[in-house]
A protein has these predicted regions:
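Intrinsically disordered, low-complexity regulatory regions
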Residues: 1-148
Length: 148
């Protein structure tokens, strides 16, 4: 009996991965161990965008990753001074949305730049939820939230 060409074989069917606490912990640990997005995608058998989306949500608190082609520096090459300002604003706990606006970038561009350059740190709430400590990841003050 021949198989129809349009039907996928059993190993072609992709089973969606749902992020539970154990997978999130592993993702964050591997990221802070230096595994890049491509390798994380391979490790978790996911597309790069799925990895970005989860890391950005966990580490930056950004849920919406809608591109905005109307911003002045949409998909343009990052310059050294721009990177310096990005790091400075991030370290001052300025929310990613405000950083993007100030730099003339869209939110996904800023978030991906922070993730790809390993400039992002783990918020204490996320570290606590995932059972991580300073030996596992770099933990700093909560980004994007005011501290008193």
């Amino acid at each position: 009996m021949s198989r129809r060409r349009d039907q996928p074989a059993a190993d072609d069917i992709r089973i969606p991965t749902f992020w539970d606490t154990a997978l999130r912990r592993e993702l964050v640990e591997l990221y802070f161990d230096g595994m890049d997005i491509e390798m994380l995608g391979w490790h978790f058998d996911m597309k790069a965008f799925e990895i970005y989306r989860e890391l950005i949500a966990l580490l930056l608190g950004v849920k919406e990753l809608d591109e905005d082609p109307s911003v002045p520096r949409f998909r343009k090459r990052w310059e050294y001074l721009e990177d310096s300002e990005l790091i400075r604003l991030y370290r001052r706990s300025v929310p990613v949305e405000q950083i993007a606006k100030q730099l003339g970038r869209d939110v996904p561009g800023v978030a991906m730049r922070l993730i790809n350059s390993w400039w992002v740190t783990c918020p204490p709430k996320v570290a606590k939820t995932l059972g991580l400590n300073e030996d596992d990841v770099e933990i700093t003050t909560e980004h994007g939230e005011e501290t008193s």
